[in-house]
């Protein structure tokens, strides 16, 4: 049996301020730092270990992973970073307060932008100061690859490309893997692993910094999955439902 651990980064500063974040490189809040430490303690108490780790190129996911591995005394574990594990790009919504955006565009429209599978928010323009294609971390992206906005389907496409090319072969070779990433990135991966419909993923919530364990067969088909706490598996009815993309 193969085990995979997924973890959404701890609360970020913009989660705290209720702002759309996307690809903006926002750090963890004090609460987020504490959440990451607790996640590491949970994994250590439950006797987990890892051979390799994956994360995005955004500091909130990277720092969460660093803290988790530090708490587990696993700072030697190789870490692979990829923009393909970044959060969904929220286009022109990035940096905006969610409540103020709902007042401007209507709650229904904002709900569609946030939760639908195939509807993109308004796009950034290339002259927008929030356009980050010149950032050195994205220098390997080809022309047209850097998104101006994304729907969940767009996010899923790049996440699964990286899953199939990089992560799946490592898992099949028997390595223990942890992925520290983002709400919509993990939603995309869970949608694929559990073969969820578009309707099914709409209501899928990923809580911050609580380890999500997938037990997989040799073909990486899920046997079962569960969240972890200090006391072991979290009962289904006690899984936190909060979410903030």
Curated annotation (Swiss-Prot):
GO molecular function ontology, one term from the record: phosphoglycerate mutase activity
GO biological process: gluconeogenesis; glycolytic process
EC numbers: 5.4.2.11
Top class in the EC scheme: isomerase
Catalytic activity: (2R)-2-phosphoglycerate = (2R)-3-phosphoglycerate
SUPFAM superfamilies: Phosphoglycerate mutase-like
Keyword list, A-Z: Gluconeogenesis, Glycolysis, Isomerase
Active site: 9, 87
Source species, domain of life: Bacteria
Pathway membership: Carbohydrate degradation; glycolysis; pyruvate from D-glyceraldehyde 3-phosphate: step 3/5
InterPro entries: His_Pase_superF_clade-1 (IPR013078), His_PPase_superfam (IPR029033), PG/BPGM_mutase_AS (IPR001345), Phosphogly_mut1 (IPR005952)
Disulfide pattern: none
Keyword Membrane: no
Alphabetized PANTHER family for the sequence: PHOSPHOGLYCERATE MUTASE (PTHR11931)
Family of the protein in this entry: Belongs to the phosphoglycerate mutase family. BPG-dependent PGAM subfamily.
Stored NCBIfam families: pgm_1, PRK14115.1
Function, as annotated: Catalyzes the interconversion of 2-phosphoglycerate and 3-phosphoglycerate.
Protein name according to UniProt: 2,3-bisphosphoglycerate-dependent phosphoglycerate mutase
Organism of provenance: Bacillus cereus (strain G9842)
């Amino acid at each position: 049996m193969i085990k995979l651990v997924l973890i959404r980064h701890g609360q970020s500063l913009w989660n705290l301020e209720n702002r759309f974040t996307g690809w903006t490189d926002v750090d963890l809040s004090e609460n987020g730092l504490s959440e990451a430490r607790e996640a590491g303690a949970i994994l250590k108490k439950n006797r987990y270990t890892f051979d390799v780790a994956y994360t995005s190129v955004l500091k909130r996911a990277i720092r969460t992973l660093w803290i988790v591995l530090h708490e587990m005394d696993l700072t030697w574990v190789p870490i692979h970073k990829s923009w393909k594990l970044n959060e969904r790009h929220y286009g022109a919504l990035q940096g905006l307060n969610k409540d103020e955006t709902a007042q401007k565009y209507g709650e229904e429209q904002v709900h569609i932008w946030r939760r639908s599978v195939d509807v993109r928010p308004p796009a950034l323009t290339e002259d927008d100061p929030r356009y980050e294609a010149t950032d050195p971390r994205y220098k390997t992206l080809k022309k047209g690859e850097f998104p101006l906005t994304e729907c969940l389907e767009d996010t899923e496409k790049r996440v699964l490309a990286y899953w199939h090319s990089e992560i799946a072969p490592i898992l099949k070779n028997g390595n223990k893997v942890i992925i520290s990433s983002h709400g919509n990135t993990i939603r995309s991966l869970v949608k694929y692993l559990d073969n969820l419909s578009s309707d099914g993923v709409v209501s899928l919530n990923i809580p911050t910094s609580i380890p999500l364990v997938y037990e997989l067969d040799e073909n990486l088909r899920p046997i079962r999955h569960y969240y972890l706490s200090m006391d072991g598996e979290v009962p289904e009815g006690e899984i936190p439902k909060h979410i903030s993309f």
